[in-house]
Amino acid sequence: MASNERDAISWYQKKIGAYDQQIWEKSIEQTQIKGFKNKPKKMGHIKPDLIDVDLIRGSTFAKAKPEIPWTSLTRKGLVRVVFFPLFSSWWIQVTSLRIFVWLLLLYLMQVTAIVLYLMMPIVSVSEVLGPLCLMLLMGTVHCQIVSTQITRPSGNNGNRRRRKLRKTVNGDGTRDNGNNSPDKIRAVETLDSAPSVGGFWGTLFGNRIKRVKLVSNKGTETDNDSGCFHPIIKKRQGRPEIRMWQAREKAKVSDGEKCRREAYRRLGNGVSDDLSSEEDGEARTQMILLRRSVEGASSDNGCEVKNRKSILSRHLNSQVKKTATRWCHIVRDSDSLAESEFESAAFSQGSRSGMSGGSRSLNLSRRDSESTRHDSETEDMLWDDLLHGPECRSSVTSDSEGAHVNTLHSGTKRDPKEDVFQQNHLFWLQNSSPASERVSAIIWEGNECKKMDMSVLEISGIIMSRVNAYEQGVGYQMLGNAVTIGLALFPFLYRLFREKSFDQLKSISAEEVLTLFCGAPPVTPVVILSIINFFERLCLTWIFFFMMCVAERTYKQRFLFAKLFSHITSARKARKYEIPHFRLKKVENIKIWLSLRSYLKRRGPQRSVDVVVSSVFLLTLSIAFICCAQVLQGHKTFLNDAYNWEFLIWETALLLFLLRLASLGSETNKKYSNVSILLTEQINLYLKMEKKPNKKEQLTLVNNVLKLSTKLLKELDTPFRLYGLTMNPLIYNITRVVILSAVSGVISDLLGFNIRLWKIKS
């Protein structure tokens, strides 16, 4: 419906625009319609020694970003928390098994508490709803943190692609090999992972990894066979089988190129026509992409494939047999109701006949997500990126016997052009041109001063090692633990000091303490409910402030990065902190300095920590708005309710953490935007001009570049803000008006005269 409306709008826009056109505009449109296909073109390349403005901003060193809007992520997070056991595999994947068991216990306790409260609504409702709100909040935040592994569903495009694949794929179902071997390899059955899986693959894929074995017609499992390759991927729990049959050998030809392409075509030809379900369509997609990628490994995609020896037609079957034994499928299965997909499939082919090709290892990987059942578009773009990327331009000889398996994560759609630009920046970053990418830096070994040519990565590595060796404080961890214990015991302490005086506390009995702890007569259901509420508040509040401590530690590390970076051009401080030192006396040094600045600003957790900080910022504003509304309702009775006291404790603790983060962020911004460093280097250049008049022209050039760098940093740098990820301008302005209006009402009610803070520019 929306697409039809857009088409109608475009049609009417062109219709009314035609009445405004003159002859010159019509001629230009005709020229644009012809396009640039007939224009002469010649090869070009990007110069990696030049820099872009993205390098100064830091966007060159891009971080992973979610493809799904934050509104959808919020909805997914709420659903995954409410139906927590149904998404067990997803939670295990993004956390761990032990943490999942702990969270599942908290979830069951929360459900039990809600049921007991509905049966006996005696205790305060805030004691039950508080942990529930914390659980929903942190589940949503965690879903946004791991959202880079969730891909956008392709929707109708994916359905159309599957229908197109069903029309284009054909399979015979009965294909014989050249030797007519009676023991044909019939199926590939996915089994549970064995502990013998290598540590590298265990680290790369995380959780359960499927092991693949070849099953013959007789029911025995084999690893190698000389027969034709008939793999069927069987999924557990009644999932449909996916059959891939080898194509029948066609007419033999003497041309080596045709034989090689025929051998590639035989490996991936045909998928059974009876695959009609949704998962079968997905399997068809993977098989066709694999086949197209294998065929594209020739000269069509830019990868050189050299035929050193003429391949005779009588050797074709033996080549196919050798290649068939080099298949390796690694399938990762998720038991979630919303997640059932392939995680990765990898293919590598090599031969002893002398064929060599660039990028023989072809990879396919899919991350777990509830929406990737319809997402064949992602794999398509991944393969195009893989086959047409710059890494396909090398030519190597593959003579290995075993299979080489390489896995490429494909969680997000990436533009190949963007990858080319990023890799060109990484070329000089990774020492591709030592003459222009290294700087002569001074390092201290004891009391000795030595020079060394260092790159950006080497200098940043030393800085990061110094930051990692820094002993972090535990003050805010202790603050979080104290607030956690106080909030967990707050209902009991509130009833205790409200109903008992200090003299009565000396002679209080255990039964009275239990009654105050439960808030009602200590019957069994009430005692169970009170104990559950205590542990829920204790655990969930501790998790919340633990995340806040992680954010504080990250901001502290960012500040240390900026602090050490600002000391690079200072000889005394560089020696004190044992980091490299160099002056901005050359244009190349200025380039390295700017690159190092952008690189360090992008190191460490970025978006994930910003999610936590933004969520805490919004929570603080929400609590402030609720408190203002309660004060406006009746400021004399505001402190009579326990939940208002609890709101004040939360607001105080959150403000302390936010003030800490704001101060660290502001200091970090000042260190990176310290123009005094560039001004000092300009003074040093003038001092050199006085001592070396023969180099005045060269030093003047460097001085001009420093002036331009100063202006550029002032132009690009923005003031630090805590809100960033979820606080777009619309939400920010609405929140500012609402909160400041509420605060204005409170102040006006307390002071007796009207004041409007929202009209004051912030």
From Swiss-Prot:
Residues 152-184, 345-415 are annotated as: Disordered. Glycans are attached at residues 179, 224, 363, 431, 674, 733. The keyword Coiled coil does not apply. Keywords: Endoplasmic reticulum, Glycoprotein, Golgi apparatus, Membrane, Phosphoprotein, Transmembrane, Transmembrane helix. Residues 365-376 have a biased composition (Basic and acidic residues). Residues 348-364 have a biased composition (Low complexity). Highly expressed in testis. GO terms for cellular component: cis-Golgi network membrane; endoplasmic reticulum membrane. The modification Phosphoserine is found at residues 272, 276-277, 334, 336. This is Protein PHTF1. It comes from Rattus norvegicus (Rat).
